[in-house]
Amino acid sequence: MCGILFALAEDRDNLLESPSFSALRKRIRARGPDFFGKHKLNSGPWNLHFESSVLHLRGPSDHLTPQPHVDSFGNVLCWNGEIWQINHSDHHKFTLNRNENDGAKLFELLNNNPGDIEKILGSIQGPFAFVYYQVRTNTLWWGRDRLGRRSLLYSLRDSNFVLSSVGNSSDFREVEPGFHSVQVDLIPKINFSKSLMQLEKTNPLPPVDESFLMGSISSDTVDTLHTYLIKALQDRVLTIPKLCSSNLDCSHYSRVCVLYSGGVDCGVLARLMHDIVPNNESIDLINVAFENPRFTETYRDRETGLLPDNFDAYDVCPDRQTGLQGWQELISVCPARKWNFVAINVPYTEVCEAQEIVKTLIYPNDSVMDLSIGLAFYFASQGRGVLLQNVDDIKLKHQLPSYTIKAKVLISGLGADEQLGGYMRHLRAFERKGMAGLEEELQLDIDRIPHRNLGRDDRVMSNQGKEVRYPFLDERLMALFSKMKTTDKMRLDLVGGDKLILRELGRRLGCPLASQEKKRAIQFGSKAAKMTPGTGRTSGRKKLEVCI
């Protein structure tokens, strides 16, 4: 994961020396604490400034690849992404082993095929945002993958054009998923209300073996989901550099963690990770809970005004309760694994202190719900809590030492609800319009993910020097889901029929408790939402007052 900052300004402009740009650069550095690099070139009256920060996650663990990537001809690439595969038939020779840097390999491929930029970018499997300058045509390319899994914002003001992973003023807007190109001299004349070149939504996803896609949820169908999820996790986990020597006990050096509530999405992912992570490594389970004054008030005795003896504001959070339950289930199923339950407890005072920076990070998302979700991910990605390593620690949690995760990669279950009918709105659509209404609502959720979720979450969690990865948004897995009959994935006419195929997989993996948990949004499960008295009826869609 990296931070991208590009600026095009006239020669006489002092944009880069402005306090605003310096503040922006500081945020870019936070995204990539391992390295920060710059490159500058001129094109007529214009200065092109490329800046990148690097969180070292690809390539040899003892050799960081600097950015921006620059070659002897003057081509430049700022890359923030992960390439799992390039599908285009013209580039079938593109191979990437786990000791190679994907950005460097892509840069070489783009430079060696100057007429195939669109084809190459459109063939990438994996999350990405990028800025690429092609010196031969004086053309600037920029964009995000079709799902918008990495953030990229733009600002065009007073002939200054800025592309950045994060923003710090109301001038910034989100770059639409897809890729865009323009000759440098024409950039100040761009009308961004008109669409530039974009990745077509009809781009074929990877092929799927359709031989099993028949009938109801059969053993073969669940087994195939198992296979696809394992592959998605292998791509996202096994490429992470180890934090210790292979001949040492690595149980104290988790290189990966799961955003963990104890639900079926994260529960299945955690259980499958046990099958691919070496046995001598631990896995961190990140569980966040908030002190919520409004929720706490509901526990006070109406006559005395006192809280129950031994009341704990964090223990009553639903995600803490299901998280501990799911953690104990994992210990029972996989006793040889060291499962670190990282309990992150967030006092209300810390929430008040963090609100303004989180508002800035989530922008241009700007609703009450965005802030609640942003706060949950902000503190979760900081990874500072207490460490529970066995069931007996639950009784001793107030005596346990503090613990901060070392992992740079967070695994998220986002994408399961959107594709497998996990939201209440899916049930309502099914009740109103039947299967056609359900399928329409499912497609709307996929279409909205780039703007509603992914850019916002990337900006928040990357600010802590962390990268979030989404196995359920793996292109091959999404292709699998798109080929399956809706009734083979979910049965909303049945109680507990949402995400039915995933729940069945969870049961087979030995996690029946996690498999029966209902959907609960992180802002409600962690109690990050509606914290102050009188906000119980506040709509999550209400706009925030954001001053940036």
From Swiss-Prot:
GO MF annotation, one: asparagine synthase (glutamine-hydrolyzing) activity
InterPro entries: Asn_synthase, Asn_synthetase_domain, GATase_2_dom, Ntn_hydrolases_N, Rossmann-like_a/b/a_fold
Pfam families xref list: Asn_synthase (PF00733), GATase_7 (PF13537)
Keyword Cytoplasm attributed: yes
Domain annotation Glutamine amidotransferase type-2: ranges: 2-193
GO-annotated biological processes: asparagine biosynthetic process
Cellular component aspect of the GO annotation: cytosol; nucleus
Protein name from the UniProt record: Asparagine synthetase domain-containing protein C4F6.11c
